[in-house]
Every structure is written in C-alpha cells, then in structure tokens.
Amino acid sequence: MAQASNENGWSDFLELCSKIKTPEAFRDFFALFLTFGERESMASRYLIIQALLADQLTQREIAKEYGVSIAQITRGSNALKAVDPEFKEFLKHSSGRYENQ
C-alpha cells in the first residue's frame, strides 16, 4: 500500500510541477519542497549533465571545474545512457549553451 501511495504522490508532484510557469514560482516551489542541500545536489547534477552533453571536458576536468566527485559524474553519465535520444537533444537545446554549435 505504501508503494502505491508513493507512486501517486510522485505523479501528483509531477502534475503540480507541470502547472508552474515562471522561474520565480519554481524557485518558491523548490524552496518549499527541497532543503538547501537537496537544491545544491540538484544544481550539481544539472551542471554535470550539461557538461557531459557538451562533451568538451573529461570526467576529471568536470569534477575539478564543479567540485563534484567522479562517482557523481558516473551516475550522471549512466543516467544519460538510459535517456531517450530525443530527450537528450531537448536537454542540449533547452539549456541555451548549444545554440551556436
């Protein structure tokens, strides 16, 4: 029963996220639901994913540049391997970092 409840909670959470339209509202939303440490972890994961997508730095260079561990980078790399190629392209083009490439 707890598993179904968690799945419903996650679905409801994602539905709520989809209704947020501005960066300011997202900032307030995540300040409510995530601790400072969780937000820092999410920011690190974002930077790792973006660096991996850019494919310009080695994992060691990414670790040094962003102050993250090789294990964190490996987890990000493994997660990217499981992502649909279309979603990966969406991530590349949504960040604004790849517009001139």
From Swiss-Prot:
<protein>
    <recommendedName>
        <fullName>Trp operon repressor homolog</fullName>
    </recommendedName>
</protein>
<comment type="similarity">
    <text>Belongs to the TrpR family.</text>
</comment>
<dbReference type="InterPro" id="IPR038116">
    <property type="entry name" value="TrpR-like_sf"/>
</dbReference>
<dbReference type="GO" id="GO:0005737">
    <property type="term" value="C:cytoplasm"/>
</dbReference>
<comment type="subunit">
    <text>Homodimer.</text>
</comment>
<dbReference type="Pfam" id="PF01371">
    <property type="entry name" value="Trp_repressor"/>
</dbReference>
<dbReference type="InterPro" id="IPR000831">
    <property type="entry name" value="Trp_repress"/>
</dbReference>
<dbReference type="GO" id="GO:0045892">
    <property type="term" value="P:negative regulation of DNA-templated transcription"/>
</dbReference>
<dbReference type="GO" id="GO:0043565">
    <property type="term" value="F:sequence-specific DNA binding"/>
</dbReference>
<keyword id="KW-0678">Repressor</keyword>
<dbReference type="GO" id="GO:0003700">
    <property type="term" value="F:DNA-binding transcription factor activity"/>
</dbReference>
<feature type="DNA-binding region">
    <location>
        <begin position="59"/>
        <end position="82"/>
    </location>
</feature>
<keyword id="KW-0805">Transcription regulation</keyword>
<dbReference type="InterPro" id="IPR013335">
    <property type="entry name" value="Trp_repress_bac"/>
</dbReference>
<dbReference type="InterPro" id="IPR010921">
    <property type="entry name" value="Trp_repressor/repl_initiator"/>
</dbReference>
<keyword id="KW-0804">Transcription</keyword>
<comment type="function">
    <text>This protein is an aporepressor. When complexed with L-tryptophan it binds the operator region of the trp operon and prevents the initiation of transcription.</text>
</comment>
<keyword id="KW-0238">DNA-binding</keyword>
<keyword id="KW-0963">Cytoplasm</keyword>
